[in-house]
Amino acid sequence: MLLFVLTCLLAVFPAISTKSPIFGPEEVNSVEGNSVSITCYYPPTSVNRHTRKYWCRQGARGGCITLISSEGYVSSKYAGRANLTNFPENGTFVVNIAQLSQDDSGRYKCGLGINSRGLSFDVSLEVSQGPGLLNDTKVYTVDLGRTVTINCPFKTENAQKRKSLYKQIGLYPVLVIDSSGYVNPNYTGRIRLDIQGTGQLLFSVVINQLRLSDAGQYLCQAGDDSNSNKKNADLQVLKPEPELVYEDLRGSVTFHCALGPEVANVAKFLCRQSSGENCDVVVNTLGKRAPAFEGRILLNPQDKDGSFSVVITGLRKEDAGRYLCGAHSDGQLQEGSPIQAWQLFVNEESTIPRSPTVVKGVAGGSVAVLCPYNRKESKSIKYWCLWEGAQNGRCPLLVDSEGWVKAQYEGRLSLLEEPGNGTFTVILNQLTSRDAGFYWCLTNGDTLWRTTVEIKIIEGEPNLKVPGNVTAVLGETLKVPCHFPCKFSSYEKYWCKWNNTGCQALPSQDEGPSKAFVNCDENSRLVSLTLNLVTRADEGWYWCGVKQGHFYGETAAVYVAVEERKAAGSRDVSLAKADAAPDEKVLDSGFREIENKAIQDPRLFAEEKAVADTRDQADGSRASVDSGSSEEQGGSSRALVSTLVPLGLVLAVGAVAVGVARARHRKNVDRVSIRSYRTDISMSDFENSREFGANDNMGASSITQETSLGGKEEFVATTESTTETKEPKKAKRSSKEEAEMAYKDFLLQSSTVAAEAQDGPQEA
């Protein structure tokens, strides 16, 4: 069962497993006695350049008999009239066959290696019989859409007689044109009859925009009687043999179209043939363009001789097929339009490396575009242009590798070369919605390496955070921060100064984690650029960015202006709201950064200072009042103490006597209630002790802690322990013992109060 399934899969998908990169003409047409030249293309790898090339004829049973090969073999049928030439530098080989006969018609293969392998291409050769020539018959062979001139001689006696041209249709001749002014409706607007001067015995019929239906036998005639002069002509209208074009996937192709000066002022077009005779317009000079080619096609201005060219970049597999260029007032293929044909094959075994065709960036952010070029042309000039779709399309240059940058892109566009790497990088930052579009990577060398990339502007915020334009003071030190989120933790981080030829790297300082990002502040970084003793030369654009090896990532730009020193002191420029949350805007600098910590709102500083000033003023007022009245209070306090102390002693003695009496009265009261009373007092004291800073459970706190992360205030409350502290057991005491202890405490307190009363007036 499994074998059956595999067999079915191989039968359904043969093209996938046997797809060949060999390419040649699908059809070749010629006539007996002529010769043909057949070109076959192959990927120019080292193995392919040196392997065997062959031309073989397919048999009825599926075999393919070799007729000629690159190893010197020539079949007897081809002896003396055929050869095979290999062009390894171009990845092509050519088979030339002369002295064609109808026996040469058939199905052939051109290929590499062994005949039975899949590295081959099928070619159909059709050899037609030559025209049946009559006496004095002239043969005209002209391509479709072109112009033919049929010359008709006559004798002197017929110089003044009627001149005419007939076409043989079936058994009867049909008048096409004559000297009296008649024109057959099928030739209206594209035929004329010219009679030469009286000294020449010749008239000519010119037919423009030849159609396939124009082919056939014609008869020129001067005069209508038996003495008339007649001349036979055979007109063959040929479909143009397509020129083979073999290009790499992701590469570029150019179609050069030369239609002649007679159509110099007629609308031009390029179309691709689909099913049957339909030819869908790819681009024309009337402004039409197929959506599939948006952003990657240009129709170059036409010359006075009617020639023009069409460039297509970023080739795709689906671009392969037959293309026609032509001229017609409608801007599309019509019968009789002069045309040229190409057969485009897109080689999927491309030498052009893959690179992103779409790059996305956010407003205010940046993009880095990788552009491949031919390694053999490392010294070529590199360009980057913006594709514009108006009319025929154009691509004005924005930057090149020789230091030219378009004025409106200064400070935010740079072309960086990587010698020997086969790529160059274009960085564009400070993005706006107007930067969305298609861009082309070019060199002044190999035109096949033109590539296209589309830049899309999407919603979001830039990943790198820098201040806006900052101002430095001459002779002072400037410090500019750049905040990198954690996603770039493994990237190389850098600062550089922009100029027309690139961005010169500058030393920078890693100041540890950045607090501008709340999700992974330990992996985020703050990297600062420091300019010591600022001079006028330090003014300009500075970039901070990330890269991995030769691949550049995001960048952010800061413009540094330089001004004279001000009399009111210097100013330290740093990132305002540097540690703000990612969804907050980064303001221009003007606030001091303190030890890479979160910058607080300046208004908070002002409020705190105002409160502090108010407190200082209040404390000062109290101090002055206390010092001014201290002397008056000293005298009155002595008299008051001398009066109150004896009274207090009397009251204390009375209280003790009452306490002793009550204690004796409660002698037989249950001691459990007394113990409970003491326990209540002890727990109350325990709770009150916290007001003075005591905390028995050091692992728990009832205080709510406040933490500032990323400029946002986040409050984290710790959980207080619910475990109660048990009161330790104490020894039981009688009521008498308690009364005696209370009396001793009273005597000690009375002695202390008396001592303070005596010492107080002396110190005052």
UniProtKB/Swiss-Prot annotation:
> Which stretch is the leader sequence?
1-18
Entry-linked SMART domains: IG, IGv
Parts of the chain on the Extracellular side: 19-638
Q: Name the SUPFAM superfamilies for this protein.
A: Immunoglobulin (SSF48726)
| InterPro entries xrefs | CD300_family_receptors (IPR050671), Ig-like_dom (IPR007110), Ig-like_dom_sf (IPR036179), Ig-like_fold (IPR013783), Ig_sub (IPR003599), Ig_V-set (IPR013106)
Question: Could you confirm whether the keyword Coiled coil appears in this record?
Answer: no
Basic and acidic residues bias spans: 609-619, 723-738
Q: Which GO BP terms apply?
A: detection of chemical stimulus involved in sensory perception of bitter taste; epidermal growth factor receptor signaling pathway; Fc receptor signaling pathway; immunoglobulin transcytosis in epithelial cells mediated by polymeric immunoglobulin receptor; receptor clustering; signal transduction
Annotated glycan sites: N83, N90, N135, N186, N421, N469, N499
Which Pfam family name is an example for this entry? V-set
Identify the residue ranges that face the Cytoplasmic compartment according to the record. 662-764
Q: What's any one GO cellular component for it? A: plasma membrane
Where in the chain are disulfide-linked cysteines found? Answer: C40-C110, C56-C64, C152-C220, C257-C325, C271-C279, C371-C441, C385-C395, C482-C544, C486-C520, C496-C503
User: Which residue numbers delimit the Ig-like V-type domain?
Assistant: 19-120, 145-237, 250-352, 364-458, 462-561
Phosphoserine modification sites are S673, S682, S689, S735
GO MF annotations, alphabetized: polymeric immunoglobulin binding; polymeric immunoglobulin receptor activity; transmembrane signaling receptor activity
| Residue span of region Disordered | 609-637, 717-738
- How the protein assembles, per its UniProt entry? Interacts (mainly via CDR1-like domain) with dimeric IgA. Interacts (mainly via CDR2-like domain) with pentameric IgM.
PANTHER family the UniProt entry points to? POLYMERIC IMMUNOGLOBULIN RECEPTOR, POLYMERIC-IMMUNOGLOBULIN RECEPTOR
What is written about domains in the entry's comments?
A: The Ig-like V-type 1/D1 domain contains three complementarity determining region-like loops CDR1-3, which mediate interaction with IgA and IgM.
Name of protein: Polymeric immunoglobulin receptor
Q: What organism is the protein native to?
A: Homo sapiens
Q: Report the gene name.
A: PIGR
